[in-house]
Every structure is written in structure tokens, then in C-alpha cells.
Amino acid sequence: MTNLKAQKRLAASIAGVGINRIKVVEDYIEDVQSSLTRDEIRNLIKDGKIIVLKKVGISGGRLKERRKKRSLKSEGKKSGSRKGKKGARANSKQMWVKRVRKIRAYLKWLRDHKVIDRHTYRELYLKTKGGNYKGVSDVRNVLIQMGKIKG
């Protein structure tokens, strides 16, 4: 076998790929061996006497299949795989909306059952909107302090 190391190196440099992706067609080995300049090598690549192979990737098909099966079973999502806190993983806006809805429902129930008057309701409602209360229990504590309900 003839030594085409220099020609392959030049072809790789011209094509911008590694040496392993350069292949010389068997019928044109003599032509390639006689060419020494970058211009000659460039012409050989154009003529198809030197072939630049396509990049070989890694197939992700099997991995996708495995991941899909795991996601269908909800694997890898339980407490052992979680690194962040609940607040880091959950959408903070959704958490806020959920909390505010609970508090508002509680306030509405209190107003409808005549536990608090509409002025107190409005005051607490606006404070809830402003983010004063962490939850329903916080609102209960405030109402106990106000003397509106018994502890």
C-alpha cells in the first residue's frame, strides 16, 4: 500500500475535517500520490477522486425509546430523584394563584355565613391580593387576633 499521509492531511485541512474522514478512491491512487499542492488536492476533491466522508453521529433512537417508556411509567420523577425544593420545582405563579384562591374562598365562606362583615372581608381580600398572608391558617390567626372568630 502506498503512503498517502501527506495528501490526506492536506485534503483534511482543505475540507476542514479530520484525516479519518478522507478516503481515496482505489482507481486514482497514482493521481493522488503524484499531487503535492493544495490546489491539486482541491481539484481531486472536486473530481471525486478524493472523497470526504460524512460525519457519523450517535443514534439517539434507543435512548429516546427508553426515556419514553420511563416517562410513561413516571419513573425518575419521585422524591429520590428530586434535588430542588418544592418551591424550586413548582411554578411560583401557579403556587401563588392556588394559595390566593384558597384564601379568597375561605373569606367568601366567612362573609356568606355572617362570621365577618363586608368591610372586614374587603380589607382582608385586598391584603390577600397584596400577598400579606401565607395561607388560610395565617388569615385565621389574623381573625383570631381581631376577635372575629374564636381560637
Swiss-Prot record:
GO molecular function: large ribosomal subunit rRNA binding; RNA binding; structural constituent of ribosome
Pfam families per record: Ribosomal_L19e, Ribosomal_L19e_C
CDD domains: Ribosomal_L19e_A
Residue spans of biased composition, Basic residues class: 79-88
Segments for region (Disordered): 62-93
Signal peptide: none
Ribosomal protein is among the record's keywords: yes
PROSITE patterns in alphabetical order: RIBOSOMAL_L19E (PS00526)
Keyword rRNA-binding among UniProt keywords: yes
Keywords: Ribonucleoprotein, Ribosomal protein, RNA-binding, rRNA-binding
Cellular component, GO, one term: cytosolic large ribosomal subunit
Top-level taxonomic group: Archaea
Any one GO biological process: translation
Function: Binds to the 23S rRNA.
HAMAP family: Ribosomal_eL19
Quaternary assembly: Part of the 50S ribosomal subunit.
Stated family: Belongs to the eukaryotic ribosomal protein eL19 family.
Protein name stated in the entry: Large ribosomal subunit protein eL19
